[in-house]
């Protein structure tokens, strides 16, 4: 499918619909939840296909009730429909192409369309009519407040006009007296300040102290560099720093960030963890159904520039700083955690916006799930 054609389809669909039915489970999904919902449904559909092709597995063997219910919905839709329209671009697609086609649409949004989503969609649960109503209420409130304030000010001015005219002479006399007092006070301050000024000998002594302090700092820095060269065979200036990105993708913000979460269980439907250097992906850890409380305990427990330790089972580095920012208007939650690698290079930890998707990642490393559970149990 050509991207220009896909762009027009998605653009038209986003402008005309606040919510649509998912092509996998037929649940009604708001615009803002499309990427995460579809990604999760893709994975559950793959799991369902594996189940029906397995001689030993059945849907009844699934322990998670929510997951089981979702897969049952997918099964009903799978059996009833051979052709359905894509939720994102509305193209008619055959059942066996659902996953490939949906991933293509999601990938397009991720790479070319993310800013449109951020700019256009503020809250998924507010439609155009309620927005217009809110604007009307706000405008009326501002208008009425302005009118009331003007009336009150006019009444107050009329009430005090006579008093002001009668007191003009008294005020003028008081002003003259105040000016004289301020002038005398200022003169006294200048005299005291001059007496407190240090002599030239004291100034020279302070300069010498600062000079010695700087020299001591230079000696310490030199010693540190010598130690680094001894331990690692090079100094910091000789190292070509590598930028390492660790990305967290999820389809909803946690409730600690103040963003709305749909559903009673308040769980993150998709949670993924990626470590890479440049374009090379080193590790991928993927989890589902992370409760926001556990999410908080895992990554938010030490807030704002406090150091935390990440166990070596996950990454063999020590975190030396934390910084968290949130943009509530655009559902943008970003967190940077700085690591030290042999006291030289830095690793950055990114919490990406909810519109970042997992569609381009083809393989998953699940072995680190137990390590994350250990952290949450600490």
From Swiss-Prot:
Annotated region described as Disordered, given as residue ranges: 150-187
Basic and acidic residues bias locations: 177-187
Domain of life, source organism: Eukaryota
Segments of skewed composition (Low complexity): 150-176
UniProt-recorded name of the protein: Putative uncharacterized protein DDB_G0271698
Source organism (scientific name): Dictyostelium discoideum
């Amino acid at each position: 499918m050509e991207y220009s054609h896909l762009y027009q389809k998605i653009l038209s669909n986003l402008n005309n619909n606040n919510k649509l039915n998912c092509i996998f489970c037929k649940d009604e999904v708001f615009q803002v939840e499309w990427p995460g919902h579809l990604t999760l449904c893709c994975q559950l559909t793959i799991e369902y296909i594996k189940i029906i092709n397995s001689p030993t597995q059945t849907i009844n063997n699934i322990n998670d009730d929510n997951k089981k219910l979702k897969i049952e919905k997918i099964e009903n839709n799978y059996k009833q429909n051979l052709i359905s329209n894509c939720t994102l671009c509305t193209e008619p697609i055959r059942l066996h192409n659902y996953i490939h086609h949906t991933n293509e649409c999601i990938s397009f949004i991720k790479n070319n369309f993310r800013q449109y989503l951020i700019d256009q969609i503020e809250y998924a649960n507010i439609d155009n009519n309620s927005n217009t109503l809110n604007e009307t209420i706000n405008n009326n409130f501002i208008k009425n407040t302005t009118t009331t304030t003007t009336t009150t000010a006019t009444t107050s001015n009329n009430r005090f006009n006579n008093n002001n005219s009668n007191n003009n002479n008294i005020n003028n006399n008081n002003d003259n007296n105040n000016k004289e007092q301020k002038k005398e006070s200022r003169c006294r301050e200048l005299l005291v300040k001059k007496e407190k000024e240090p002599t030239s000998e004291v100034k020279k002594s302070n300069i010498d102290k600062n000079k010695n302090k700087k020299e001591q700092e230079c000696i310490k820095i030199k010693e540190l560099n010598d130690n680094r060269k001894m331990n690692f065979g090079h100094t910091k200036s000789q190292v070509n720093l590598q930028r390492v990105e660790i990305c967290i993708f999820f389809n909803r913000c946690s409730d600690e960030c103040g963003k709305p979460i749909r559903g009673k269980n308040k769980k993150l439907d998709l949670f993924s963890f990626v470590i890479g250097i440049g374009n090379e992906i080193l590790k991928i850890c993927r989890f589902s159904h992370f409760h926001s409380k556990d999410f908080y305990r895992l990554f938010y427990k030490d807030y704002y520039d406090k150091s935390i330790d990440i166990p070596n089972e996950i990454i063999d580095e020590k975190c030396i700083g934390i910084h968290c920012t949130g943009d509530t208007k655009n559902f943008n939650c970003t967190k940077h955690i700085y690591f030290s690698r042999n006291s030289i290079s830095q690793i950055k930890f990114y919490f990406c916006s909810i519109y970042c998707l997992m569609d381009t990642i083809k393989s998953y490393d699940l072995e680190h799930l137990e390590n994350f559970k250990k952290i949450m149990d600490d």
